[in-house]
Amino acid sequence: MLKFPCLVLDHDDTVVQSEATINYPFFCYILDQFRPGQKITLQEYTHGCYHTGFAQMCREKYGFTEQEMQDEYLGWQAYIKTHIPEPYPGIREVIHRQKAEGGLVCVVSHSCNENITRDYAAHIGLQPDDIYGWDYPEHQRKPNPYPLLEIMKKYGLKPEQLLVVDDMKPAWEMANKVSVPIAFAGWGRKDYPEITEEMTSLCNYAFADTKDLYNFLFES
């Protein structure tokens, strides 16, 4: 019997290594186009996404208009079509074991569905059961609990039958609102001890490596 019938996985920096190699470099380009002369470090970018979420960071810190938000999104979509991130070692085994045991794998992410399905096809060899990505209206994206409520409704699951696996605080906010347990994907935040410390204290579980998650789910 599975410990959690449904895994709810983040995508960026949980399944694939995309922040430093794809998302941050593109945002530097966009910032130079929209706000010439303004700079952002990788650490500032990470902390902005962690504490406020990407969209709010763009609006509050850089004053992006709604048109600029839309232009950024369209540019990002075009950029990531030719930039495919690598998966974290071991995450494929977690996903395949969950499915082999009859479980569900859903994705709740700020990536768009097209890129998630592409990455799963390229690296995982199967597709998630459901995806709640950036394509959804903003009020239905994490940290709003809408994705979790929809998953529970669709599959007839209770909160304790889901496990969110994510590296960022908005996921904790989402899960906490509906009493769904969450595991910190520490393998995506090894260079950020302050984030690791806070998420470890907030989340129900914390794992430094995908192997630790695998052992917890299937071997313990």
Which role fits each region the language model picked out?
Residues L2-E93, E101, E114-N115:
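N-terminal helical cap/lid subdomain that shapes the substrate entry/recognition surface
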Residues Y73, V94-A122, Y132:
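Substrate-recognition element of Asp-dependent hydrolases with the DxDx(T/V) motif
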Residues G90-V94, P147-E150:
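Well-ordered alpha-helical segments embedded in enzymatic catalytic cores
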